[in-house]
């Protein structure tokens, strides 16, 4: 009995230890999420448009200048991981009922998280969004190779490949390949696309990202109507 009680006690402690990181992560981002909500109360963003979520690549993205003809909402919070966007999906996605959600996350996971786990976290994000918004399209921007994390490039590419395969199984999902777009003649990341930290993008880097993403955001033009037959041809 004593041994059993000890085992139960240890199990309880382990469960508590596992629960702490999730709560700590929620607390870590609470100020950022609360700031979004406060801004919404002052000026409510439009519904049914495009929401961008994810880490600092999203946060630093000047969406208004990148897509002046589109209505976009930036809900990026720097340093976040894929699981964080899922954790707050009811506060940073669902309230806006977007037609498209653009996701960039995984840069901060890749150092310590297996590629397979990043894919699982993205799948959870998709399920969380579609549970409330089944018609919303989700566009995942592939994790970009970077100078800072070039040593992890194989893990980046594995995660991207698996997420692409997942997206190909659902018409509501899309995948943007960033790999070739940021590499130079030597097949390494082009230095001019990254700021001094070797991770975040320069304005030129964002120009490339804009060009990659835009085709997925702009509705396809309606097919032209067939010309009416002239009286001479009747």
What is the predicted role of each segment?
Residues 25-124, 147-157, 161:
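Conserved SGNH/GDSL esterase-like catalytic core that processes O-acyl groups on lipids
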Residues 147-234:
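Catalytic His-Asp segment of secreted/periplasmic serine-dependent ester chemistry enzymes
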Residues 119-141, 158-173:
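Charged, glycine-enriched surface loops/patches
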């Amino acid at each position: 009995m004593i041994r059993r009680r000890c085992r139960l006690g240890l199990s309880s402690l382990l469960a508590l230890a596992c629960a702490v990181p999730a709560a700590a992560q929620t607390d870590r981002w609470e100020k950022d999420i609360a700031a979004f909500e406060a801004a919404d109360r002052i000026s409510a963003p439009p519904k049914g448009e495009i929401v961008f979520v994810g880490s600092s690549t999203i946060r630093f993205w000047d969406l208004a200048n990148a897509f002046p003809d589109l209505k976009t909402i930036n809900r990026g919070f720097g340093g976040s991981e894929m699981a964080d966007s899922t954790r707050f999906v009811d506060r940073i996605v669902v309230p806006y009922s977007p037609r498209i959600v653009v996701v960039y996350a995984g840069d901060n996971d890749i150092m310590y998280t297996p590629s397979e786990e990043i894919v699982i976290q993205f799948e959870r994000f998709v399920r969380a969004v579609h549970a409330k918004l089944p018609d919303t399209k989700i566009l995942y921007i592939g994790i970009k190779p970077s100078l800072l994390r070039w040593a992890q490039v194989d893990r980046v590419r594995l995660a991207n490949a698996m997420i692409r395969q997942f997206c190909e199984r659902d018409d509501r999902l899309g995948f943007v390949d960033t790999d070739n777009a940021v590499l130079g003649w030597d097949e390494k990341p082009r230095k001019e696309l990254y700021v001094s930290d070797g991770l975040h993008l320069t304005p030129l880097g964002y120009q490339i990202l804009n060009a990659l993403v835009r085709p997925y955001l702009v509705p396809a033009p309606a097919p032209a109507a067939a010309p009416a037959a002239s009286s001479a041809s009747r």
